[in-house]
């Protein structure tokens, strides 16, 4: 259910784009992300840092898209967000000694520290590659193809990555 909740702004962006175009879709994404943060704050009294970062990036890049009437800003937003996630994962681990992947998943999985470190680097690399892939699609395909990639391509890549990661992790999990 959380996965669908996380996709809420992207799905609304996709639908709004198909019906009204990029600029209305951008406004819808900003409002949807604001609503998402408000709901999480109301429901849980705490909003994850990643969601705050997502909100900041969509407001800045979406706002620039609307004010300057230039769709490139909203198209760059996923790359900036993915690269911030990648940098955040690596900086937290190597500058501050905190493995954010372990912090998020440590209650569900018991893994040795070197495995957590590999997982952290794998996620950072995954986000870095997604950022590059987004730029490639932005500059080599139509706006409509980019919107399809944004919803289906990146979501599909995420699902495949999680499945592969799960298969890799099975060798480290003990029978409980």
Swiss-Prot record:
Signal peptide: none
Any one cellular-component term (Gene Ontology): plasma membrane
Keyword Phosphoprotein found: no
Classification via Pfam families: IspA (PF04279)
Membrane topology value: Multi-pass membrane protein
KW Cell inner membrane (keyword) present: yes
Sequence intervals crossing the membrane: 3-23, 24-44, 49-69, 72-92, 121-141, 149-169
Annotated localization: Cell inner membrane
Keywords of the record: Cell inner membrane, Cell membrane, Membrane, Transmembrane, Transmembrane helix
PANTHER family referenced in this protein's UniProt entry, alphabetically: INNER MEMBRANE-SPANNING PROTEIN YCIB, INTRACELLULAR SEPTATION PROTEIN A-RELATED
Biological role: Plays a role in cell envelope biogenesis, maintenance of cell envelope integrity and membrane homeostasis.
Family designation: Belongs to the YciB family.
Name under which the protein is recorded: Inner membrane-spanning protein YciB
